[in-house]
């Protein structure tokens, strides 16, 4: 089955510390995880690397989140929605299940 979420989709977090927050998918990983801009931040302790001119310290980094814990955000209804597929003019397109509108 095709993966229903894609890069640059506006999503909402369903569970976890960032529950209810909205963001944009930055990257989809092959392990059914996604990286969302500005959400699910973790602190990473980085050693300085003088050879690469990188400073050390405690950095905040976006961690991957399970795809099952996020849902696409329907801006018309202002809530989470499910995605379906259908064919329009010979092309497979995604649509919101609640109001049957095509996802751009």
Curated annotation (Swiss-Prot):
Keyword Calcium in annotation: no
CDD domains assigned: KOW_RPL26
Pfam families from the UniProt entry: KOW, ribosomal_L24
Keywords, in A-Z order: Ribonucleoprotein, Ribosomal protein, RNA-binding, rRNA-binding
Stored SUPFAM superfamilies: Translation proteins SH3-like domain (SSF50104)
PROSITE patterns: RIBOSOMAL_L24
Subunit organization: Part of the 50S ribosomal subunit.
Family: Belongs to the universal ribosomal protein uL24 family.
Name listed for the protein in its UniProt record: Large ribosomal subunit protein uL24
Gene this protein is translated from: rplX
